[in-house]
């Protein structure tokens, strides 16, 4: 990949553009308590996110990154349903964009890049979140965790984007904060841009060997905007 080749940039949402853990933690805590289990803290939930809501709730009920195999499917489904309700009720008021996110998206949009969102978050929550934080209009495609049969690190969403926009893997860049994002990019054959903040279960993003590592989303402009 050379910078001049990139046409489409796919972004993860939670932990990349948006710190959503404060709201997710409130909902997870309420859901686990509602089914008679101990509650969870924001610190715990920071460690549990990144693999979709079903996994988040399984971890919260288990109080561990490893889900307790003795938890019944019925209990997990009940807790997940409650979690969705509680999360909707938060109104995403505690979530906030990371620094430089809006300015960076605006600059990329104005420069003519196609921007897409590829998140493991349930699709039904995504449009409101994007709208609320004033970034909905930058994205041509918004793909949630249930848009396809498999979530990241499966490359199905990235492959779909390449097919839709008729581009090659060398023309796409995946931007994310977790191992799943970097692996999805590798599995799709495209380059990846890993952010050091966000949610990656305490593991440095560099361990997943993205093509670029950055502390701020604004550094993405240095990678893709080649000065005239």
UniProtKB/Swiss-Prot annotation:
Keyword Coiled coil applies: no
Enzyme class: hydrolase
Reaction catalysed by this enzyme: 2-phosphoglycolate + H2O = glycolate + phosphate
GO cellular component annotations of the record: cytosol
GO biological processes: carbohydrate metabolic process; DNA repair; glycolate biosynthetic process
Cofactor names: Mg(2+)
Cysteine disulfide links: none
Associated pathway: Organic acid metabolism; glycolate biosynthesis; glycolate from 2-phosphoglycolate: step 1/1
Entry's Gene Ontology molecular function annotations: metal ion binding; phosphoglycolate phosphatase activity
SUPFAM superfamilies linked to this entry: HAD-like (SSF56784)
Enzyme Commission no: 3.1.3.18
Sites where the protein binds Mg(2+): 12, 14, 177
UniProt keyword terms in alphabetical order: Carbohydrate metabolism, Hydrolase, Magnesium, Metal-binding
Pfam families according to UniProt: HAD_2 (PF13419)
Active site as annotated: 12
Gene3D superfamilies assigned: HAD superfamily/HAD-like, Putative phosphatase, domain 2
Listed InterPro entries: HAD-like_hydrolase_sf, HAD-like_sf, HAD-SF_hydro_IA, HAD-SF_hydro_IIIA, HAD_2, HAD_sf, PGP-like_dom2, PGPase_prok
Biological function: Specifically catalyzes the dephosphorylation of 2-phosphoglycolate. Is involved in the dissimilation of the intracellular 2-phosphoglycolate formed during the DNA repair of 3'-phosphoglycolate ends, a major class of DNA lesions induced by oxidative stress.
Protein family (similarity comment): Belongs to the HAD-like hydrolase superfamily. CbbY/CbbZ/Gph/YieH family.
Protein name per Swiss-Prot or TrEMBL: Phosphoglycolate phosphatase
Protein's organism: Vibrio vulnificus (strain YJ016)
């Amino acid at each position: 990949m050379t910078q001049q080749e990139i046409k489409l940039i796919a972004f993860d949402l939670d932990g990349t553009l948006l710190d959503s853990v404060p709201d997710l933690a409130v909902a997870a805590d309420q859901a686990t308590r509602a089914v008679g289990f101990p509650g969870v803290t924001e610190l715990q939930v920071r460690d549990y996110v990144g693999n979709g809501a079903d996994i988040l709730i399984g971890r919260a009920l288990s109080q561990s990154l490893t889900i307790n195999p003795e938890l019944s499917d019925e209990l997990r489904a009940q807790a997940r349903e409650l979690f969705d309700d509680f999360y909707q009720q938060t109104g995403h008021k505690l979530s906030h964009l990371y620094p430089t996110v809006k300015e960076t998206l605006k600059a990329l949009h104005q420069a003519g890049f196609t921007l897409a969102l590829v998140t493991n978050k349930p699709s039904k929550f995504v449009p409101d979140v994007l709208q609320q934080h004033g970034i909905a209009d930058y994205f041509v495609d918004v793909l949630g965790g249930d848009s396809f049969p498999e979530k990241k690190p499966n490359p199905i969403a990235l492959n779909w984007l390449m097919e839709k926009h008729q581009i090659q893997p060398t023309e796409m860049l995946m931007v994310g904060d977790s191992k799943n994002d970097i692996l999805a990019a590798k599995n799709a054959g495209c380059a990846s841009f890993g952010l050091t903040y966000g949610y990656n279960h305490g593991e440095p993003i560099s361990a997943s060997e993205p093509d670029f590592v950055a502390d701020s989303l604004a550094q993405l402009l240095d990678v893709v905007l080649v000065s005239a």
